[in-house]
Amino acid sequence: MTVYTFDNTLDGLLTAVFDCFFSKQQDVTLLADGEQLPLFADEPHVVHTDSGKAERVWKGLEKQLSKDGLHMITISWLSEERTLNQPLFNFICKVFRLKAKDLERNASDPDVLEVRNTCRRVLHEQLRMKQFIRFQKAKDGTYLAVVSPDHNVLPIIIDHFQDRFNDQPWLIYDAKRHYGYYYSLTPGPSPSRATLLPSGGRRGEGRDNKVIRVTFEDEAAVPFDLSNGKLDAEVLSDNDKLFQDLWRTYFKAICIKERMNPKKQLNDMPRRYWKYMTEKNGK
């Protein structure tokens, strides 16, 4: 049994595909660093991530797959599911070995099916994030939303919010992965008045320089609660609490008790999202 270990990045996985074909090996078990080796396995081959090798593999995929097929690979990878590594590796290897243009649509292949289903789960959560994100307004005019999705969907929802809220600064922060995106009204240095923004940030994650990918060096010092997304009282806009109370009142007022269906509500709006939703997290 041939075992490859890699750094659990997409470039690392593509490099593993390159190494597999370069060494002309057929059956390879791919494991992320730290995963337990199978019993009686030989000394594993450690994959050293190489952006050049990864780029060559990706260009090869562009020749073999449609845009939907490439999209399926990148979106499924955002799931961050360790169980995807082997099926995705197998799928990419089959693309080059079989050279079948319709392989990406072959649902009878277990590897293709797993990648497709994973892609669907990520896209489903992407839709839910667009629906369930709730913003609060800080005194400096910045809008904050804290989320904690199962999958790493922030990179594929930012354009949606940039289109809809391009006239106001906002920060969407993933508490689970400890990073977020800040949208500024103008490109260039971050405004010093943005009290929600950390001192350091990296630009270039969105369509233009108005979007910054940010992390906080000390999350304990941020002016909001990561457990429920609430802004600290001294930072919250003077009238935002009023709007929150009005929204909760409206939410209760439109509820028809005789038609309440908790099971349906949980199916449409899973409980794991409630802690960050104004209408569900109480006062």
What do the PLM-derived regions correspond to, one by one?
Residues 1-52:
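N-terminal ordered "arm"
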Residues 3-11, 43, 47, 105-108, ...:
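Short, charged/polar micro-motifs that form catalytic or ligand-binding hotspots
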Residues 12-23, 90-94, 159-163, 245-252:
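Short, hydrophobic/amphipathic alpha-helical patches that form generic packing surfaces
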Residues 31-127:
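Charged, alpha-helical interface segments at or near domain boundaries
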Residues 101-185, 210-221:
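Internal, well-folded beta-alpha domain core
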Residues 167-169, 181, 212-283:
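Long, compositionally biased intrinsically disordered terminal regions
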Residues 186, 194-195:
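Ala/Thr-enriched low-complexity intrinsically disordered regions
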Residues 194, 200-205:
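Glycine-biased, low-complexity coil/linker segments
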